[in-house]
Regions:
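Aromatic-anchored segments of alpha-helical transmembrane domains
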Residues: 35-40, 99-103, 148-153, 255-265
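Membrane-interface micro-motifs in multi-pass membrane enzymes
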Residues: 1, 57-73, 213-216, 221-225, ...
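Structural signal for the C-terminal ends of transmembrane alpha-helices
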Residues: 11-21, 77-85, 122-132, 154-157, ...
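Membrane-anchoring hydrophobic segments
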Residues: 1-40, 168-169, 281-288
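Long extracytoplasmic/lumenal interhelical loops at the membrane interface
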Residues: 53, 57-59, 161, 167-224
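A membrane-periplasm/extracellular boundary helix in multi-pass inner-membrane enzymes
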Residues: 108, 125-168, 184-189
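Alpha-helical transmembrane segments of multi-pass inner-membrane proteins
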Residues: 7, 22-49, 61-128, 234
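Hydrophobic transmembrane alpha-helices and their immediate junctions
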Residues: 88, 130, 136-137, 223-258, ...
Length: 288
C-alpha cells in the first residue's frame, strides 16, 4: 500500500501546472539547496571506515545516499553554466559548486555515486555542446580543454580508498549479486506473489542477510509485485517521452540517477521522489 499512497500523493502534486519562470525558480532552489548541503559537509562531516559521512539522524547521511543528493543540482548547474543569460559572477559560483560537489562525492568513496554524477555531468555537457559547437566553436573548444583538465586533476587526486574500491571491487561484504539471485529465484518459485508482491519491506527477510537488496528496481518489484512495478515504469516512460524535448536536463538527471538506483535501495528517498516529481511536472509557457 505504501507505493500506491506515494504515487497517489505524487499524482496530486502533478495536477498543478508550472510556468517556465516557476520552473527556473525550482532549478535555482536546487542550486541553493546544494550550497546548503556543501556547507553542512564542511561543518558536520566526519570520516568513518575511510569514507565521508554527514552527521545526521537519518539514513540520508549514508555515503551512497549523500552522493545521490548531488545529481539533480549538478545537472541544473551545467545547464545554467552554459546559459548566455547568466552573469559571469554567477557562473564562477556555479563552477565552484560543481568542483566542491565532486570533491565531497569522491570523499564518500561511493563507486556508484561517482559514476552516476560523472555520467550526469558528462552527458549534460555533451548535450550542451551540440549547439555550442555550431554557434561558438572557439568557446566549445575552451570548455572541452578545461573539462579534460578537470577530469585529469580529479582522477589524479582521488582518495586512496576510492581508487581501491574502483580497482578491486566492493569490499564492504554486502554481496549484492548473490542477494539479487536469491530474490529472483524466490519470485520465480512464487508466481502469484511475484504478481501481487511479497509485501512492503519484505525483501530484507528473503535476502538471507537481513539487508535490503541495494537495487531500487528489484526492491520495488519484489515488495510490490508487477501490479506496483508496472504503473511506475509506465509513468516514468511516458514522462520521459514528454520531457525529452521540453526539459532535457531533467531527463538527463533521471537517466543518470538510474545508474545509482541499480546499486542502492532508494525508492523512499527524498531525492528520488523529487526526481519523479520533476520528470512528471507540467511546464507551460509564461503568459505575456
Amino acid at each position: 500500500l505504501v507505493i500506491y499512497a506515494e504515487l497517489l500523493f505524487l499524482y496530486l502534486q502533478l495536477q498543478f501546472p508550472y510556468t517556465e519562470s516557476q520552473y527556473k525558480k525550482i532549478k535555482v532552489a536546487f542550486l541553493i539547496h546544494n550550497w546548503i548541503l556543501l556547507i553542512l559537509c564542511f561543518t558536520s562531516g566526519s570520516y568513518m571506515d575511510s569514507r565521508f559521512w554527514l552527521k545526521s539522524a537519518t539514513s540520508g547521511a549514508d555515503p551512497n545516499y549523500l552522493s545521490g543528493w548531488f545529481v539533480i543540482p549538478l545537472c541544473f548547474a551545467v545547464e545554467l553554466l552554459f546559459s548566455e543569460k547568466i552573469k559571469k559572477v554567477w557562473k564562477i559560483l556555479i563552477t565552484a559548486q560543481v568542483v566542491l560537489s565532486f570533491y565531497f562525492i569522491m570523499q564518500t568513496a561511493s563507486k556508484s555515486g561517482l559514476i552516476t554524477n560523472a555520467c550526469v555531468l558528462a552527458i549534460a555537457t555533451i548535450y550542451t555542446f551540440r549547439s555550442m559547437i555550431k554557434e561558438h566553436p572557439g568557446r566549445a573548444l575552451t570548455v572541452l580543454v578545461i573539462f579534460a583538465l578537470g577530469v585529469f586533476i580529479a582522477v589524479n587526486n582521488m582518495p586512496a580508498y576510492l581508487v581501491q574500491r574502483l580497482s578491486n571491487g566492493d569490499t564492504t561484504g554486502t554481496g549484492r549479486f548473490p542477494m539479487w539471485v536469491t530474490l529472483a529465484e524466490t519470485m520465480l518459485n512464487n508466481p502469484i506473489k511475484m504478481i501481487f508482491g511479497f509485501g512492503t519491506s519484505a525483501v530484507k527477510y528473503y535476502t538471507g542477510t537481513g539487508l535490503v537488496s541495494h537495487n531500487t528496481y528489484l526492491d520495488l518489484l519484489f515488495n510490490e509485485g508487477l501490479v506496483g512495478f508496472i504503473p511506475l515504469v509506465i509513468y516514468i516512460a511516458k514522462s520521459i517521452r514528454i520531457k525529452i524535448k521540453k526539459c532535457p536536463y531533467t531527463v538527463i538527471a533521471f537517466l543518470g540517477m538510474s545508474v545509482l538506483l541499480l546499486t542502492l535501495s532508494a525508492f523512499n528517498t527524498r531525492f528520488f521522489m523529487l526526481l519523479l516529481f520533476l520528470i512528471g511536472m507540467d511546464v507551460t509557457e509564461d503568459l505575456e
